[in-house]
């Protein structure tokens, strides 16, 4: 590079350093204002803790009671959109079983009626050692005529069990069979003034059923035998659909109802007019007018009820 080129480059550098400006050096220079401090953000409020389920079992209760009831605090409850969780408290004293509940299902709630899901505090008290009436005649059938509505017991999760018929509305299903009319969820319940069950799905009321969708969620392939699903208002237990004949541990049977569908009838309306009770001889298999029978069983009760497999007539689509 020759001297002329060096001078040119140097001159450019000097002009660049001077900025080419022509400002008045005597002008006053304003001080730079101090920056405005950023506002302190408000603290983020702690989230409201989600409600949790409650389960309390009295240590004084006998072992078969402790085994019968499910720990609903381990279940997910009716769903995030419902600000409620199941509560179940069981105690035993003075020869009685006392159950307190808020009537909230432990599984996802699926609306099947116009009624909202609400918490409703309930208390049920039944004898720990119920006895059979000396007359051995049903004491409550037909108390309100042929219509059997309302409280007929409670489940092992603290839900109402209602009778086999619905109310008088809608007219085309008045006093009909809610299973046949397809107005129950997959666990056999729906809402009125409170959530309640008209039917049982054993998958929802066994120790493996404490999930969001127990009717369809995978479960171990277990054949539940003489499982207590709930209790009647007299204190006798309600077993599931399988048991051993005479508690022999060998001969597995599925008890059957002695009510038979009358030819040409269906239980869409006035379900009680669609069936007739036909007494059978084999009392190990066929149940009495209250859907129960007497024989030895693993839980020590002489008499007990059964929920049954729903086979006929086929429920409506």
Region annotations inferred by a language model:
Residues 1-7:
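Bacterial N-terminal signal peptides that target proteins for export
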Residues 30-50:
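Ser/Thr-rich, Proline-interspersed low-complexity disordered segments
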Residues 139-232:
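Extracellular-facing segments of soluble proteins and assemblies that are Gly/Ser/Thr-biased and enriched
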Residues 277-309:
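C-terminal structured interaction module
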Residues 16-17:
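C-terminal motif of bacterial Sec signal peptides marking the signal peptidase cleavage site
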Residues 310-317:
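Conserved small/polar residues in nucleotide/adenosyl-binding loops
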Residues 49-175:
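Solvent-exposed N-terminal domain segments of exported/luminal and surface proteins
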Residues 200-272:
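Short helix-loop boundary/capping segments
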